[in-house]
């Protein structure tokens, strides 16, 4: 039976193979941090990429929604009937944003913050598990792991994890290696009744920010996990069964490198598209052009009149005129759902869809925008 270790681990985790992969991962992560700074309005990356991460992290748990449904829900289209799965994905995005708001200034990730993230994610205040009976099962419904059952033991391990997250004097090891250890420890403690996997992946994103490896929580680790789902769970269990920390840490470091590279490409594509839109909008809109209008079209894959009114502080008539002019010049597509009009940035949504995992990997068939509406 696996005994959850007290952190730091009493073994050398910086093997030759780990250090080699660590160098590659850190280089790629530093490049992503720099590329992200080329988008001057951080809310664009926060809003668009967090929605992507929310969708993909939820897909790891077989909570599936389409891009189309997710963007409609994000646009708060009242006439759109939101599915239970889409609500859960939107809640994930809200939980990640809430966590980022809580850690961005003091750069500390406490248990109270982790609990609040899970509370937003699951819409309950149950906190850490107090009742026994939680077991982790495989697809054949066989118990493969039993996490701590008593509340006191859970609190003991989580207090230790909190200190390990925030106190680098406990172990002189690179933050990315620590992140791999933290993620495994959180999964093994399994402190909540629900939402442990998704909360753990949010902790990953927030940890990269508090260690200043990224300024924004925009790394796509969930995409890598989806593509390597069976290996992900195999390696988590391999640590418990065989103490195979090296292979697990290598898996995480490779994930950081791979997903950082993919996110770099995505951010660059968004930047290029924004520049193209800026040039076209200056011609189309003339003196009516503003950075706020451009930013709005990239903050929300689906925008609406109310968003324009709010962001630009203009009247409803003016906001409607702006959007209709952009539609008539091919920069947006006007769509109607019930009594609501909304405006789709098709070029942006296409980029985001193309950067999602393949349909077979996340159990989702993504159809064209026109078919989904």
Which residues does each PLM region occupy?
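FIC/Doc superfamily catalytic core
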Residues: 1-373
